[in-house]
Amino acid sequence: MIKYFDLQRISDSFEPEISDVIIRVLRSGWYLQGEENHLFEKAFADYCGTTCCVGVGNGLDALTLIFMAYCELGEMQPGDEVIVPANTYIASILGVIRAGMRPVFCEPSLL
């Protein structure tokens, strides 16, 4: 078999550092939140050139928080319509609904 993209070769260079972090997390017992999470959030915020970063468990949580933040900032409000592609993953819709908004389905155009 000819490998199209050798992920093993790429990940081998990161393996020692990643293994060390995994061991620290396992030994600490903090699988959610914890010091490693806070260190990552700080490093990622620095990398992005911003002051804050919030790690979430999945894309649905991320979308929900984004829409809730827009409401908090007054950019959107519950009941607003949010256009979503008709053929999408359910998290795209649930994030809108969780924030109290209404998804409006549309077919993308390739004009």
Briefly describe each language-model feature range:
Residues 1-30, 35:
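N-terminal "arm"/small-domain region of PLP-dependent enzymes with the aminotransferase-like
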Residues 6, 22, 44-45, 82:
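Short hydrophobic motif
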Residues 9, 89, 110:
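Short, glycine/acidic-enriched loop or turn micro-motifs at the edges of active sites
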Residues 30, 35-81, 95-99, 105:
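Phosphate-binding glycine-rich loop
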Residues 86, 105-109:
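Short beta->alpha connector loops at strand-helix junctions that form conserved
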Residues 87-93:
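Conserved coil-to-alpha-helix start sites within the AMP-binding
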